[in-house]
């Protein structure tokens, strides 16, 4: 039997050229589809992540500013105004830090009752924080009611109230004992500023304790152009530049992604931007 | 033989399509799940913010509810005594819990926890708020036992004194400051055996006694009235009790509280802490009996005899007294055209009676400044 002769039932080993070409075409087409799908999904993934990050920045930024400003006290015509300076992209104010009730006062010390009536994210800090103690010599009259600002002259110490319960002893000076009912309201505050600050070439919402040490620290960002916009309104809803007249604050935060995101249409270099606006009602304004 | 060859041929023709497809599906599924996770995180963040806001609103409702439904019983809670109130649902998924702590000088600290509940009733968000409150004591310009915008005429055998005097047998009164006997925008005229004494005895032609000195506290207190009585005659005011165990009967319009204290006879102790604000939009004639608190009369007040009252009397019309046995311990303010105190009455200035009448009868309001507090517990 000649070697070149193939019987009808001889097994067919290998592929024909057409089969190979067909297989390669199918392979390339499938691989291209998979690659395109992966690219698409990767873009979607990155865009979604950037958008989520930008929105989280917006939410946390606006909540931070709103929470800080909501508790601000303001009295039209002056008096007990906690807004010290107001601008379109910064605000300086007394930020409330602790609250509770006194259990003992003397000329140079205020003891704050610890326990469930005391509230604060951190302990008072000397110099940086100040005391606000409610004075009301004549409880039958509101005309002498006032929060008296006193310095904190030493680190607060653990102590006891006259009844033996735990207290926080805060050193101060210039307190006129007869002006206070004990127990009575007490607060602490620090002078704060919120403003735009730059770090690593990016803009952030920064916070700085003006009564403490240290500079402006970025807390939320990155923000886009005009990242923090504040409009101050009086009781009639008109914008005002007088701190004591402010009743509401319109707050706009504009966020920006960390890096450019390729758009689904193929565009390159677009930075995701988003914004959130809300109105903060000053709960202690009158 | 032929079947074996065909099987071998099929094995040889296996391609990469299935493997590639599986790999592609896995990669795509991973990417989709990544996007899904990112979206879930974003949505969870948004939901969290909404729930936190709802919890805050529940806490706000708790603050407002306490002020709207203030009970004068809170005014006498023990100092430092935390008073926790039952939790209240706000809508289908909100809840607040209040704790009220009394301080001195008529001040309170209200703490409220607001919860947002999930479908199974579990807490999914909590916020804490607080508010400093004070008793809504109106600004009362009391510088004398009797304050009148018009002239004061004292006759008969009356005794008006501005020296601070506690009601008989009352205990726990802080020392007060002596005031004038009578203070008037016109003249104070005493006839017969009448006596007007104090520090000073009289303040006459006081131009500061304008309408608002009388109408401002009148209108404020009127809004907190315990008893609103039509104009007319009222006789024999007596403290009464009801129920078992017995308690002061606030539903009885002739029960104006118990000013007497032991060892006086017939003291109704259940009503010693009852200081009603009695308001009449018309004119009143009162005759015999006793009471305490704040008496507000928009018209004229005529006290005819044997009527004892501890607290504050504000009359926007004229005040006239007659007969014997009348006694007011506290302060009287009259804006009307004439004040004629004749017969055999006594009017004693009492800082203690004034303070108790106010502190036991008024509701609370937020401190004027820095009352609202964001708390962490």
Question: What spans do the regions from the language model cover?
Answer:
Chain B
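Aliphatic-rich helix starts adjacent to a transmembrane/signal segment
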Residues: 16-58
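Short, ordered "entry" segments at domain starts
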Residues: 101-240, 245, 270-377
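N-terminal leader/signal peptides at the extreme start of proteins
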Residues: 1-14
